[in-house]
Amino acid sequence: MKKLVISALAFASVAAFAEKVAIKFELPPPHSSGTPKEIKSDNLEKDRGPGKLRPPIMVEPEYTKKLTNEDTKVTTSEEAATGENEFVVDGDKTPDATAMLQLPGGVQWVQLDLGAEHEISAVCVWHDQGDERVYKDVIMQISNDPKFKEGVTTIFNNDHDDSSKLGTKGKDKEYRERNDGRPVSAMIDDKPTKGRYVRCYSNGSTSEPINNYIEIEVFGK
């Protein structure tokens, strides 16, 4: 009897996994505007090498809808140095200044208003990938509070020394910017994170103090 129960559970587990599908991120072509710099950081992830993508984010089909579009409201911590807020949701991932939102140096954030609470499965952010630079203090959060004072869920944080002064030392790794951006799962205990607002932080990069954002996409239902 035990064998039958174990077999049934194993079959159910396999069946459940088989029902999941990968979230499809539309990637821009690789782009390099300079020789990648040697970057020394104890918090930098092992280099995957050009062209090698991260493992797919697997979710149930109902959570694969892209929730962001050109009508998504975008706000920022400070007025843009160059570019427009809507650049980060217009679908154009061209890695140059014509599609780039640039915020001043220091800790800055870009916030998306999805219009209503959604069940969020993943967030992906693209910064400037020009010389495979590394952006500092990359943090992604979800909340129903537009001021992010209450009910905040952090799905990614590589600010390992709390230099952003948000009060938490992150455990995620820094990474080189490439054409696949940084996709992050918002599934916690196999359940999506509920929220209306998505906020993405950064604190300049290894190439310059300015914070460059190409695109931010949110998926879920």
Language model features with spans:
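A short beta-strand element within beta-rich, extracytoplasmic domains
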Residues: 119-130, 200
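Trp- and acidic/polar-enriched beta-sheet ligand-binding modules for extracellular glycan
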Residues: 19-30, 103-108, 130-221
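Predominantly extracellular/luminal regions of secreted and cell-surface proteins
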Residues: 48-92
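Intrinsic-disorder/low-complexity, polar/charged segments enriched in Ser/Thr/Lys/Arg/Asp/Glu/Gln
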Residues: 107-111, 122
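Hydrophobic h-region of N-terminal signal peptides that target proteins for export
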Residues: 9-17
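Activation corresponds to long, low-complexity, non-globular regions
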Residues: 19-56
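A short glycine/threonine-centered beta-strand motif
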Residues: 114-116, 143
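Positively charged n-region of N-terminal signal peptides that target proteins for export
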Residues: 1-4
